[in-house]
Design a protein with these regions (language model features):
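N-terminal targeting leaders of membrane proteins
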Residues: 34-117, 121-128, 132-137, 224-225, ...
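Alpha-helical transmembrane segments that form the membrane-embedded catalytic/substrate-binding core
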Residues: 120-127, 164-191, 310
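Outer-membrane beta-barrel proteins
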Residues: 133-139, 188-193, 253-264, 317-323
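Transmembrane beta-strands of outer-membrane beta-barrel proteins
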Residues: 152, 156, 199-201, 269-275, ...
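Transmembrane beta-strands of outer-membrane beta-barrel pores
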Residues: 205-209, 277-283, 317-319
Length: 359
């Protein structure tokens, strides 16, 4: 009985806690909030019982205030395993069909309408940022964690460049190295200057519908455009990395983060403005021709290559208010993905297009 009376004294505070939500979301959600408030009060004061599994999970996801050696070992071991698995995966996706040779350099700037350079830039940025968040989770202080993130991003991309250097199909590219460094530098510069990522580098990808138009080689072999594109770019998941016709690279800016924290902007703090770059009808490094495994060459010169420039809205999921550590972790993990939104396109053919939703 005494516990019940004490709970009633807590009822106004609980209702005030849910009252703000009542003004925002009417109807069923409001009723559920009120029921939850009453249930919270009737549950009585906290006891010394062990926290529920969900609470322990939330605590596990929260960054540690001090260096947590167990987390550090877990992150280091998991990172080493992921590094090994990724290196093996990249070898099978990119390099296994080409012989290895002596280490050599190769100037590939301008190939693939520079979509591969955009890929290097955004990948180096994303790797650095996610490694930084992992370091912070273990309790490493902010500035050292930023340098660790930059080091991890540099190491991962350097692995690819070294593989390129020994592959007869490619070579070590100083242009790739420059874009890798720029991606890492964008992350590190923002972290050291603002302790925040106000400009996020993101990607979106939708594989085009290549269609069934016939292509005939000089030897009389016929394939469809879809089949030729699959020869060049592969199928999912390899095509997500390799198909430059479906990829768009974005710089997503959060305007609210440039306002003083005490000054509330007139738009949501999670709303971003994004500029994007893409290309279409890219069927080769410089020219549009695809060679299959039998040596048949299919020309696609009838499909002119062009570059695309985009302006779109976006959302910085990390800035959406939530008390759920699980959601915060998920939002951080997805922070490199551009969300579908209304988009304007300008391209090198002189066209302008509008999309209600573009991804």
């Amino acid at each position: 009985m005494l516990q019940f009376l004490l709970s009633l004294l807590r009822l106004p505070a609980c209702l005030r806690c849910f009252g703000a939500r009542r003004r925002l979301v009417p109807g069923t959600f409001t009723r559920r909030c009120l029921v939850a408030a009453v249930s919270c009060c009737l549950a009585g004061p906290a006891t010394s019982q062990s926290p529920p599994a969900e609470s322990r999970f939330q605590t596990f996801l929260a960054p540690s205030d001090t260096l947590h050696k167990g987390r550090l070992r877990l992150l280091a071991g998991g990172g080493a395993a992921a590094y090994t698995a990724t290196s093996i995966g990249l070898y099978h996706i990119w390099y296994k069909d080409y012989p290895l040779g002596k280490f050599h350099f190769f100037d590939d700037y301008g190939e693939w309408e520079n979509m591969d350079k955009a890929g290097h830039f955004l990948t180096a940025y994303a790797e650095s940022y996610l490694a930084y968040k992992g370091a912070r989770w273990t309790g490493i202080r902010e500035r050292p964690a930023a340098w660790i993130g930059a080091g991890v991003g540099t190491l991962l991309q350097a692995t690819i460049e070294v593989m390129d250097g020994f592959s007869e199909g490619w070579g070590f590219s100083t242009a790739d190295l420059a874009f890798n460094t720029a991606g890492v530098g964008l992350f590190l510069g923002q972290e050291l200057l603002w302790q925040d990522q106000r400009i996020m580098v993101k990607v979106s990808h939708t594989r085009p519908n290549y269609g069934a138009a016939p292509l005939t080689s000089s030897t009389g072999v016929t394939r469809t455009v879809e089949e030729a594109a699959t020869i060049l770019y592969g199928k999912f998941p390899a095509s997500f990395i390799k198909d430059y016709n479906g990829m768009t690279a974005w710089a997503s800016v959060n305007p609210a983060s440039f306002f003083p924290k005490k000054k509330k902007p007139f738009f949501p703090r999670w709303l971003n403005i994004a500029g994007g770059y893409g290309a279409q009808n890219v069927y080769g490094a410089y020219g549009n021709a695809i060679t299959d495994q039998e040596g048949n060459v299919f020309s696609l010169q009838q499909y002119p290559r062009y570059r695309q420039y985009y302006l779109s809205l976006d959302a910085d999921l990390r800035r959406i208010p939530t008390r759920s550590r699980a959601l915060r972790t998920l939002f951080t993990a997805l922070s490199w993905v551009k969300l579908p939104a209304p988009t304007m396109e300008w391209n090198s053919l002189g066209e302008q297009k509008f999309y209600w939703l573009y991804w």
